[in-house]
Amino acid sequence: MKGLFIVFEGITGSGKKTHIKLLAEKLKESGKEVTVLSFPNYESEIARFTKRADLDAYTQSLLFAADRSLYQERIKALLEKGNVILCDRYCYSNFAYQAAKGLPLEWLKEIEKHTIKPDIVFLIDVPVEISMNRVKQLSIEDFTKKEILERLEREKDFLEKIREIYLSLAVTDKETKWFVINGSEDISVNHEKIWKKVKEKLKIE
């Protein structure tokens, strides 16, 4: 029995983690085996290396791709067992963030061409202003929150570019099925939309 591979994408503060948590709970209630993954996985040495300030964008992109490459056999095995994989970011984050820095999108796709493609990508789309407001409301240490908000403020235009690239990928990527979710809407409304699509795919009554 083949499992289902679902990826959630979106800018910081879009609500990916919330929707992954809600969907995981619903799937478990339906008797499904669920595995949650997140990329970059900063527990791996490769991903930690990407935080070095002296790295150029090309090297960083290759390291992010290598981090995902380490997990391909595990993803394959889980899918063969019938698991549902929920992934917080995948290769599309590399495409959007690095292309926004000016790297060629075709090159970014080339270095990730051997990654297992998901069955569904949910793009949780929110305007940058909303993403910043949500970060303000997060229950995290004030210093960490201040640091994130300062970075978001500095990178406002950059985040707008990332958002545009994500929306473009949702239209042009023919290798997998994308669903754009209006992340400005009520969480419970969006959860029901997501659950409806997943139920259809898994043939859950």
Provide a role label for each language-model segment.
Residues 2-5:
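Pre-Walker A (Motif I) flank of P-loop NTPase domains
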Residues 8:
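Hydrophobic anchor at the beta1->P-loop junction of P-loop NTPases
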Residues 11:
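P-loop (Walker A) phosphate-binding loop of NTP-binding proteins
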Residues 16:
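Conserved lysine of the Walker
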Residues 19:
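Hydrophobic positions on the alpha1 helix immediately C-terminal to the Walker A/P-loop
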Residues 24, 132-205:
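NTP-dependent small-molecule kinase module
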Residues 32-116:
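ATP-dependent small-molecule kinase phosphotransfer cores
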Residues 94-164:
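A glycine- and Lys/Arg-enriched "phosphate-lid" helix/loop adjacent to the NTP-binding pocket
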